[in-house]
């Protein structure tokens, strides 16, 4: 007798992925409609199910009890034990599948979405909540929604070094001296051919000294070091801040990811992504203290709104989104007020310089 996990396929990917990880079995039965074939492909990719010999797909009419019962009767055997996940699919699919399997050797499960647990609803009078022993990783999450991971960044230096850089930019940044050094570094960042020695760029060594940043080579910077100094340090800082706050594993959080859904869609870049309470969270990190002018503040917000709207409406991915910036966000400034108001409509949380300087930091930014 073998164990077979039965899953109902719908737009929700995570409940099925959770049960696949939680219940190692001998074979899999997926019940779906014709329209859900692509989503099943994403689920199998995320779960690492590549052996077609242990996978059976049953195409049904999602709104027909008779069709579902007839097709299940043709393939289900009394020789197996069935574990049935009723969380997804249409209501009729769930009811029809539940009615069918109750007359067979089976267990029926449902994932309510609250807490990190699922319910065994059959057999037995009691309906115990059972804690998941496994967790969904960030990579599994995005794969389950059809995304390809094009790039992942890594922390350039230690969290302690990045903490020093953060404190300098937040409290001691000199727009005249440091701003000039950053202009030079940005030009070098755009030069993809080479990154020459400092030469006459005497502003840069002084800037590095004030930051307490020690490069690999004393007289020039690597490409990655220049990227770090011109803004990516803030992504690294927020990554470590969030990871420590929620005690996340390396598999639950990422920095500098580039995701693409389908070859015809433009890749999206994300500064910090993480999974918390089985939900995807995105933080866009912008060190706009380096630049002057309210148009930059506005562009950060509108760019993020566009990205969130595209993810939701075109790519089917919903995430809690935040913008972290070291700019002074003055809502009385007419040039950015409309963008901030629009961000609120999209439930995008914005944390500015004042939030990072607040006496209750960092707890205050996680309560917004």
Tell where the protein language model's regions lie, with residue ranges.
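A broadly used, surface-exposed interaction patch
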Residues: 27-87, 91-106
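Intrinsically disordered, low-complexity Ser/Thr/Pro/Gly-rich regulatory segments
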Residues: 136-368
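N-terminal beta-strand-loop-alpha-helix module at the start
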Residues: 1-42
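Structural motif
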Residues: 3-4, 7-11, 27, 32-35, 81-83, 86-88, 258, 279-281, ...
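Short, aromatic/basic amphipathic alpha-helical patches
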Residues: 19-21, 39-50, 333-346
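Short, acidic/turn-prone active-site loops that include or flank metal/cofactor-
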Residues: 10-11, 32-36, 59, 112-115, ...
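Mixed-charge intrinsically disordered linker/loop segments at interdomain junctions
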Residues: 94-165, 169
């Amino acid at each position: 007798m073998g164990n077979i996990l039965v899953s109902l396929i719908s737009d929700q990917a995570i409940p099925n992925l959770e049960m696949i990880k939680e219940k190692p079995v001998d074979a899999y039965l997926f019940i779906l409609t014709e329209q859900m074939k692509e989503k099943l492909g994403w689920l199998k990719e995320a779960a690492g199910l590549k052996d077609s010999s242990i996978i059976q797909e049953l195409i049904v009419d999602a709104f027909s009890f008779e069709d579902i019962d007839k097709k299940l009767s043709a393939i289900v055997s009394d020789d197996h034990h069935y574990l049935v996940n009723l969380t997804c699919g249409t209501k009729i699919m769930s009811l029809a599948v539940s009615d069918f399997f109750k007359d067979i050797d089976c267990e029926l499960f449902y994932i309510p979405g609250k807490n990190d647990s699922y319910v065994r609803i059959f057999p037995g009078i009691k309906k115990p909540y059972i804690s998941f022993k496994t967790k969904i990783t960030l990579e599994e999450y995005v794969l389950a929604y059809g995304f390809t991971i094009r790039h992942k960044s890594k922390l350039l230096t230690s969290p302690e070094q990045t903490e020093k850089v953060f404190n300098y930019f937040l409290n001691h940044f000199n727009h005249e001296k440091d701003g000039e050094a950053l202009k030079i570094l940005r030009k070098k960042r755009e030069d993809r051919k080479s990154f020459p020695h400092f030469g006459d760029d005497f502003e840069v060594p002084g800037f590095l000294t004030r930051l307490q940043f020690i490069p690999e080579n004393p007289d020039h910077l690597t490409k990655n070091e220049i990227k770090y100094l011109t803004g990516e340090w803030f992504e690294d800082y927020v990554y470590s801040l969030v990871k420590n706050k929620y005690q996340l594993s390396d598999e639950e959080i990422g920095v500098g990811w580039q995701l693409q859904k389908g070859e015809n869609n433009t890749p999206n870049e994300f500064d910090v992504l993480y999974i918390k309470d089985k939900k995807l969270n995105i933080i866009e990190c912008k060190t706009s203290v380096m630049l002057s002018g309210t148009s930059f503040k506005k562009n950060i917000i509108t760019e993020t709104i566009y990205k969130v709207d595209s993810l939701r409406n075109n790519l089917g991915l919903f995430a809690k989104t935040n913008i972290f910036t070291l700019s002074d966000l003055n809502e009385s400034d007419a040039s950015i007020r409309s963008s901030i108001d629009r961000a609120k409509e999209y439930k995008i949380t914005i944390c500015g310089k004042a939030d990072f300087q607040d006496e209750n930091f960092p707890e205050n930014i996680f309560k917004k």
